[in-house]
């Protein structure tokens, strides 16, 4: 199980993980690592939250919010943001399904993808600033948001099909069992409720799961399934929705 955790950490983040820690693990086994997603989100969000706490006394809330969101993007190598941009480029092209998938595979950034990145990053910075002004514990909020975003992404894997013939998303999409889905969501709920006591964390998690479930259904109807890009989009939007739900 520890090998699976390190493999997942290396897979969806840019944190340095020695290869020997996940040695001997086949790529096909990665689908079992979905239950680790909330914990990985907890780590990434925790680092982002610490950066906010350390910088806020020195440069104020707005700049601290900017740098903590920048740190989160760097920690993931922009992996999920790239998926968000590609998804928006494809979906909003208003082309046939096959052409949408081709556009999503194109490495060039389009207008819709650029607008999506600007909107999501700016929205995150603004909502983090507003939460801090309201006295929200930002270490807990950011850690819980990242756990919720990654945990809720399982809703785009369970009982969904892969929209392409091959790709990284094929490791998870359609390969996750109902038991793994329940465990992943349950762990994300536990993280959110422990870090944000009372109904605040639980309510934000419910809102996030509902929004991501609807997103998954809309993407399935439009693309005929999910891709690695749509998973990245779900994670980014899940984080933002969770933070907005805390307001």
From Swiss-Prot:
Q: How does it sit in the membrane?
A: Multi-pass membrane protein
> In the UniProt record, does the keyword Thylakoid occur?
no
Keyword set includes Transmembrane helix: yes
* GO CC terms in record: plasma membrane
Q: What is its EC number?
A: 2.7.8.26
Q: Which UniProt keywords apply?
A: Cell inner membrane, Cell membrane, Cobalamin biosynthesis, Magnesium, Membrane, Transferase, Transmembrane, Transmembrane helix
Q: Where in the cell is it found?
A: Cell inner membrane
- Pathway assigned in UniProt: Cofactor biosynthesis; adenosylcobalamin biosynthesis; adenosylcobalamin from cob(II)yrinate a,c-diamide: step 7/7
Return the HAMAP family for the record.
CobS
Role played: Joins adenosylcobinamide-GDP and alpha-ribazole to generate adenosylcobalamin (Ado-cobalamin). Also synthesizes adenosylcobalamin 5'-phosphate from adenosylcobinamide-GDP and alpha-ribazole 5'-phosphate.
Q: What is this protein called?
A: Adenosylcobinamide-GDP ribazoletransferase
Q: Which organism is it from?
A: Salmonella typhimurium (strain LT2 / SGSC1412 / ATCC 700720)
> What lineage is this protein's organism placed in?
Bacteria, Pseudomonadati, Pseudomonadota, Gammaproteobacteria, Enterobacterales
* Gene name, Swiss-Prot/TrEMBL: cobS
């Amino acid at each position: 199980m520890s090998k699976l955790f390190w493999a997942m950490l290396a897979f969806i983040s840019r944190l340095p993980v020695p290869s020997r820690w996940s040695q001997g693990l086949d790529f096909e086994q990665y689908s079992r690592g979905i239950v680790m997603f909330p914990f990985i989100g907890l780590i990434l969000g925790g680092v982002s939250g610490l950066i906010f706490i350390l910088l806020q006394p020195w440069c104020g809330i707005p700049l601290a919010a900017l740098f903590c969101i920048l740190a989160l993007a760097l920690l993931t190598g922009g992996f999920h943001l790239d998926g968000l941009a590609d998804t928006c480029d494809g979906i909003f092209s208003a082309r046939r399904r096959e052409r949408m998938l081709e556009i999503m595979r194109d490495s060039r950034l389009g207008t819709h993808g650029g607008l999506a990145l600007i909107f999501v990053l700016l929205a995150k910075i603004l909502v983090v600033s507003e939460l801090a002004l309201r006295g929200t514990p930002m270490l807990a909020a950011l850690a819980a948001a990242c756990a919720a975003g990654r945990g809720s992404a399982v809703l785009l894997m369970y009982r969904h099909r892969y929209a392409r013939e091959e790709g990284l998303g094929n490791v998870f999409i359609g390969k996750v069992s109902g038991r793994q889905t329940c465990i992943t969501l349950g762990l994300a709920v536990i993280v959110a409720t422990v870090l944000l006591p009372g109904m605040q964390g639980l309510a934000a998690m419910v809102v996030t799961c509902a929004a991501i479930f609807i997103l998954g259904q809309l993407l399935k109807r439009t693309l005929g399934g999910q891709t690695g890009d749509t998973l990245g989009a779900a994670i980014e939007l899940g984080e933002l929705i969770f933070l907005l739900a805390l307001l």
